[in-house]
Amino acid sequence: MNTKLLFAALLCTTNAYASCGSSFCSVNTHWDTQGLVNDDTLRVDLRYSYAKADTLRGGSSKISPAQPAGSDTEIENLRTINQMLDLDLDYSITPKWNVAMDMPLVMRDHTHTFDSSISGPFVQESKFNGQGDVRVAAKYKFDSAEHHAGSGMSLGIKLPTGAIDKTMTPPDPANPTTPYALERSAQPGTGSTDMLLGAYYHNDIEDSPWGWFASGLLQSAVSTRDDYRPGNSFNLDLGAHYPFSPALTGLLQLNAQFKYRDTGLNANPASGGHSLNLSPGLSFVVAPKTNLYGFVQVALLQYANIDPADPGAGQLTAPWSFAVGVNHSY
């Protein structure tokens, strides 16, 4: 199948591994990295993803939250509901060169207990809808002597277009007139400019209905703001697809994610970690060049870094998530 490069970014993944549980479904929904679409001038993908982080984890184990004791600190004993709506545009300049842009809308509802020494423990909440960080990539497809296989790489940039000033209510009773800042890792944006390097390979097995792909993405902040640097991350996907009929295709992915700890004065030391997820899904052709698709992702392994100074302070994690979407080619 003749395909062109699509940026091998896991664009539905952002800010995974933070104490507030600001994670998203990490499934790969870029079809030409998987050899599932033909060359087209423009492709448009609209995707919704959902993850509810309500399991506190330290290392690979579930842990119990601290008990209120008037510590004037946050206790992550409740939940974070993460939703994202992604609009992904991919345009072919030449048969070998593409450009792509991802524009996310972040919808997040985070609650935790504030352990006040003045009023006693109470629930704080931050709920918002806001633009996330936009990503732009230039992509190149390598020549291949095999018509059933393809590979490529990409170089991109994540721009600091998302807000970093969201707050929680009510504020700290000790400072009732001062807005209480939401943790930086749970903001719509990171405030950083990141470089993105991706690569992929796909192969439709000869004399077989099966096809498979592998893709990876490295992300690293090169410019930061306000004493906060998100940790470097690496995502790796391995997947397979099988056509049940001309219109219905079964999908299966194994998604691995590795993220270093955030750093800076405004970073939470309880951040970063690694995970391995299994993601079965389906894609259905509803009209010429138009597909509907869906995935459910289940965590096989989750490891959440703890705060070295406070081993009892873990991170909220999501045991499962899902993504649904529609894509159309022109």
Map each language-model feature to its residues.
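Residues on the lipid-exposed face of transmembrane beta-strands in outer-membrane beta-barrel proteins
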Residues: 46-48, 87-91, 101, 136-140, ...
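Outer-membrane pore/translocation modules
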Residues: 107-230
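Outer membrane beta-barrel transmembrane domains
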Residues: 57-59, 63-67, 222-330
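Repeated loop/turn-to-beta-strand initiation elements of outer-membrane beta-barrel proteins
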Residues: 42, 97-101, 136, 146-148, ...
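Transmembrane beta-barrel strands of outer-membrane/channel proteins
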Residues: 44-50, 101-105, 153-159, 199, ...
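Outer-membrane beta-barrel proteins
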Residues: 29-33, 93-95, 139-146, 151, ...
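Outer-membrane beta-barrel biogenesis signature
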Residues: 17-70, 146-147, 161-163, 184
